[in-house]
Amino acid sequence: MSWTTNFDKLIEKSLLNVNKICDVKSLPSNLAIAKDKSDAIVYKMHGDVDNPDLTILTRDQFEKYQQTHKAFLDSFCYDLTNKTFLFLGLSFDDPNLHYVLKYARMLHGENQRRHYYILRKVSQEPGEKTEDFEYRKREQELFIEDMKNYAVETILIDDYSEITEILSAIQKRYLRRTVFISGAAVEYTNYSEKEVKEFVKKLSARLIRDNFRIVNGYGLGFGDEVLTGAAQQIQNDHKTFEENIKIMPFPQGLPNPKEAWHQYRQEMIQNTGISIFLMGNKKDKTSCTIIGSNGMQEEYDLSKSHGNFLIPVGATGYKTKDLWTQQMSAHDNSFSPTKNEMESLDDETKSLDEHLDTIMSILERINS
C-alpha cells in the first residue's frame, strides 16, 4: 500500500516490473471500487496524470480539498491509525497532510501509532555563511521535534543513496516473515512416511500460528500436508488464507517445462526470505530408481542467490543431506544457522518434533 501526492506513474510502473497487479485510487469515486486480485493499492491524493483536469494544483483546490476529497482524507487517517508509514520525499507543507496528522493526534493523543520520515541532514553549502547554515540547521531541528508531536520519528541521512540501503534492510526484514518450504518424497528411510507427513503438517501450522507466511510449490508427497496444516491453523486463528499461504503447483504438459519451471521457482522464491529444505527424492523415469531431486538443488541455489536464510534439515536425508553438507562447508553464517544448530538439524537420533523445535527456535532468533 502506497500513498503519494505525485501525479506520475513511477510507482505503478515499478510494481508492474515485478509482476504486481496494482489498484490505483486517484479519485474519491475510485475508493469504493476494488480491483480483483490486486497485489498493491496506490492512493494518489492529488490525482493522476491521465486526468489532468482533476488534479489538485491550485490554492483554491487545496483549500476545498477537505470538502471535495473527504473520502481520501478519511481513508488516509484510517491507514495512519492502523498501519506504520515510512514517509519518503513528502513535503509536510501540504495543508491536507497536516490536517490528517492533527486529526489522528486529536483522536489518539499519546497512543498514536509510530511512523517514520527519512530526511537528509542539512549541510553547509559552499560559500554559505555560517550564520545562515546554523539557522537552517536549527530550523530542521525544530521541524524534527514538531514531527514527534504527530508520532513521526525522523531518520536523518547524509546522502540520498542511503535510502536504498534502508529500504533493502526493511525489505529483508519483511521477507524473513515469509517461508518457502521445499520438499518432495516418494521414499522414506530415516523417518516413516506417517512421521514425515505429520511433521510437515505441524511445521505449517506452527509457522501460521507464529505469524509467518508460507510459499510452497506443492511438491510430491508434501503439498497436501503443507496445505492441510496451514489451512487448519488459519481457520483456528480466524486469519485469511490469501494473506498467510501461497500454493503454486507446477504447471504440467508444457512444451519446455524446464525453462518454465525455472521461472516459476524464481517467482516463488523472490517473495520469501527463508527457505526450509526437507528430504528431496524422486523416481528416475528411465531407471525407475530413487534419486535426489535436482529441482531442490535449483531451489537451494535460487534461494541462496536471493539472499534467503537457508535451513536444510539434513536428518531427513536424500538431496537435503547433500545441501546440508554444501552449507556446512561454505562457512558463511550470513545465510545459515549456527554450527550447533546445523549439527542438531542433521541428528538422525532426534525425533522430527525435536527438529521442529529447532527450526522454530532458529526462526525466532533471526527475526528478533
Predicted regions: what they are:
Residues 1-178, 185-192, 209, 232, ...:
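SIR2/sirtuin NAD+-dependent deacylase catalytic core
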